[in-house]
Amino acid sequence: IQAGAPHDICAYGTEAMHVLRAEKGFIIIGQDTDGTVAPEDANLGWAIGKKKPDFVGKRSLARPDLVAKERRQLVGLMTEDGKVKLEEGAQIVLDPDQPLPMKMVGHVTSSYHSATLGRSIAMALIEGGHEREGETVHVPMPDGVVRAKITSTAFYDPDGDRLKL
């Protein structure tokens, strides 16, 4: 630690690593995804070699159910009140006034307070999520319904400029 002090190096824990990866929109397989999530759903379509004539999994990725618009896709969420942190696993609805049982359109996969941004951030799997960016959704919580705006999953340095130092 002393050797790193001139470079502002400090100790950190695993929670800090979780927050940092979420700020950049980096996912944890199995937490932000499940067995139903395809690469395009998780914003990982860039990793597929689409110019190749064939590859393992190509046929599977073309299945109608894997390209349906209503698939659950990974998005970012920002609560209207930045002090309110969503609960991981919380269900998401479009209309909080609908009769019970409510139609759930997704769930929160990761949720943290970002000291860098000075507010809470979350990631969620939402039906047709990529097409809904900018829309407001509702998250029933123990203390009431919380409004959240659908955003990109990259909350901090979305263009990666800080990585290009």
Each language-model region and where it sits:
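Conserved, structured C-terminal
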Residues: I1-L165
